[in-house]
Amino acid sequence: MAPTRKRAGCLLIGEIALNLNEINFSFGGLHCLRDFGCIYVENKGHAITPKIRRNEYDISGTPGTILMPGDLPETLEFDGTLFFIRDPPSQAAAQQQLRRIAAWLTNGRQRLIFDYEPLRYYMASVDDELNWGFSDWIDGGLDVTFTAQPYAYALDETTASATTSGTSAQINFVLTTGAPAPIRAEVLNTGTAPITGATLTAGGNAVQLSGMNIASGDALLIDMEPPIGAAFSDGENALPYAARFDYLTARHGPQSISATLAYGSGTKGAKITIKARGRF
């Protein structure tokens, strides 16, 4: 429903008053109200969960479909309209402001954070054309459709670490979000002996690398966020050293992630840090 009138601090939609700080958003670090003087009104509400694309097949002579593993969430759409909170002094000024807004919104995929959910963000982009219309508001409004990747991500990563002066360590990790989250791991050499091998295990899956030569102060970085990979702290690709490279995720709740290390000669020592960005 289109806005009908404004009062201090609130936008009135029918008989419902919404606080302005509850319906706006930031995109790519800029805020629609604070940086562009616009309020955002959702056109049809907003999606809570994405549509699921089932991995299913039709088989001749069999009723219905056969469901296979591998369901995938699809993208989300957030559809709304931006309205100027103060009328531009002229049509030329309005056009200049609209071009600033268009440049902001069409700058590729960025973090989209709604004010009513400040600790979560979507990775979103505006791919459709932007249209200015006069049907909903006497001074006009800019129709905007965000296409978002299927998860809302926690603004802050969950982090846990453990140190060892031997060949093994257990990292106690607690993820407070529902969906499994890809793990990022750092194995930092804090001793004098080079680290020649490392195995990380989480939930039955494992990453195993051998034949390395990680010197004191250097690190191995493993990242399960796409594009999945492993590298040393100097940027060298570590995947050629991998004997096993399963997909590691943290699940909801407390869990233990184990690390097993192999060394050359010298004093053993390492710090293992595990990170995961929760998703909803």
Language-model features and meaning:
Residues 2-58:
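Polar/acidic, low-complexity leader/linker segments enriched in S/T/G and N/D
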Residues 44-48, 64-68, 124-135:
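Short amphipathic beta-strand and strand-loop transition segments with alternating hydrophobic
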Residues 33-38, 121-128, 207-213, 241-243:
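Short amphipathic beta-strand/extended segments with alternating polar/hydrophobic composition
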Residues 57-61, 65-89, 138-151, 255:
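Oligomerization/assembly interface segments of phage tail-like spikes and tubes
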Residues 72-76, 104-106, 136-140, 177-179, ...:
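Solvent-exposed loop and beta-edge segments used for protein-protein assembly and interaction
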Residues 107, 111-152:
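Short beta-strand and beta-hairpin "edge-sheet" elements
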Residues 154-280:
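Intrinsically disordered, low-complexity segments enriched in serine, threonine, and glycine
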Residues 74-118:
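Long, hydrophobic/aromatic-enriched structural stretches that serve as scaffold segments
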